[in-house]
């Protein structure tokens, strides 16, 4: 599975972003924390498609769970 969240020092100073975009992954988390829906996020950031957003959430979940073990 290709990484959906990438870090590149040439893109936003290495901030984790959605692959192929300049949209920081943390923006999605902030939307969800604030009570917004995935659809609201996607409307504001059309360069991120639904499949990419869901895959990134899954990737982050797997990473977090593995760190907790």
Predicted regions and their residues:
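Long, charge-rich, low-complexity alpha-helical segments
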Residues: 25-27, 32-69
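A short, structured beta-strand/loop element
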Residues: 1-36
């Amino acid at each position: 599975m290709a990484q959906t969240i990438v870090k590149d020092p040439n893109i936003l100073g290495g901030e984790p972003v959605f692959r192929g975009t300049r949209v920081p992954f943390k923006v999605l988390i902030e939307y969800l924390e604030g009570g917004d829906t995935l659809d609201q996020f996607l409307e504001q950031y059309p360069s991120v498609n639904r499949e990419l957003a869901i895959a990134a959430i899954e990737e982050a979940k797997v990473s977090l769970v593995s760190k907790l073990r």
